[in-house]
Amino acid sequence: MTNQQDYTQDNDKLYRYLFQHRAVRGEWVRLNKTFTDTLNTHQYPKAVQDLLGEMMVATNLLTATLKFDGNITVQIQGDGPLRLALVNGNDQQQIRALARVDGNITENMSLHNMIGKGVLVITIAPKEGERYQGVISLDKPTITECLEDYFVRSEQLQTQLIIRTGEYEGKPVAAGMLLQIMPDGSGTPEDFEHLTTLAATVKDEELFGLPAEELLYRLYHEETVNLYPAQDVQFFCGCSAERSSSALLLISDEEIDEILAEHKGSIDMQCECCGTHYFFNKEAIEKLKSTKV
C-alpha cells in the first residue's frame, strides 16, 4: 500500500517514458489541484466535470507529443444542453478549461445527449509557423475514443488513450496514459498490441493513487522502461485587468453609458475561466480612453 506522501509527489505532473526493447513511447499525467482549480469557480453538472477532465488530460497528452512552442485548443460545440466545452493548454503544461451549459444535464447523460449535433475542433497554434485546425465528428460513445481516433488519423500512428476521471480521497482527479508506436517505423504492431493489452488492465485507483514509477512497474514489470523527469502541470488562466480593459474599449460609448446606468456606475467584467472580477467605474473608463489616445 502506497502512503499519501508517496503518491502525492506525482500530483499535477506529466511524465514521458520509452520502452528500451520496444519502439513504443508513452506519457502519463495526473491532474489534482489543476482539476480542482478548474472546477472551483463553477457549478458544473457531474457529467460536464468528467468531460472537462477527459479533455484536459487529452490536451496535456497532446501537447506533450508535439515538440513545439505554442498552444493547443480542444473544443466541443453542439446544439444540446452542453453548448460549449473548451480546453486550452500550452507547451509549458499550463492549462485552462470552461463549459457553457444551457439546459438540464443529468449525472449519467451520454456524450451525444449532452452535445446533440456537434463537432470536436482541435486547433494547434505554434508561436512560429502556420496554425492547424482539425474538425472531428463525434461519432464515438466517449470523448476519449473520439480523441484516440484523431491521434491515429492525424499522425498516422497506432495510438492508445486511457483517460479516467473521478474522486480520490474525496477530491476530484483526472488522469490518463498515452501509448504510441514510434514514428520512425521501427515499431511492430505486435509490440504495440502487447503493451496496450497490459495498459488496459490499469485500475482507477492505480491511476489516481500511485506515483508514476510504481504504476509503470505494476503494468510493465517485465519490461525495461526509461522514465524521464516530470513536467509540472498547472491551471493558468492568463486573464488580467489589462485584457479586460482592452475588451471594454471595444464597446461603444453609448453602450458603456447604458451599462453604467444599469449597474449603479460600475461595470463588472468576470473572467469566464477563473471567475476573477474586474471592476471599472466611469472615471477608470475615461482614463483608459485617454491613455489609448
Curated annotation (Swiss-Prot):
Gene3D superfamilies found in the cross-reference section: helix hairpin bin (1.10.287.480), Hsp33 domain (3.55.30.10), HSP33 redox switch-like (3.90.1280.10)
Query: In which compartments does the protein localize?
Result: Cytoplasm
Which GO MF terms are attached to this record?
A: protein folding chaperone; unfolded protein binding
- Where, if anywhere, are coiled coils annotated? none
- Gene Ontology terms: cellular component: cytoplasm
Which InterPro entries does this entry report, sorted A to Z? Heat_shock_Hsp33, Heat_shock_Hsp33_C, Heat_shock_Hsp33_N, Hsp33_helix_hairpin_bin_dom_sf
Question: Disulfide connectivity?
Answer: 237-239, 271-274
Q: How is it modified after translation?
A: Under oxidizing conditions two disulfide bonds are formed involving the reactive cysteines. Under reducing conditions zinc is bound to the reactive cysteines and the protein is inactive.
Give the matching SUPFAM superfamilies.
Hsp33 domain (SSF64397), HSP33 redox switch-like (SSF118352)
What is the annotated role of this protein in its UniProt record? Redox regulated molecular chaperone. Protects both thermally unfolding and oxidatively damaged proteins from irreversible aggregation. Plays an important role in the bacterial defense system toward oxidative stress.
PANTHER family per record: 33 KDA CHAPERONIN
Can you say what this protein is called? 33 kDa chaperonin
Lineage of source species: Bacteria, Pseudomonadati, Pseudomonadota, Gammaproteobacteria, Pasteurellales
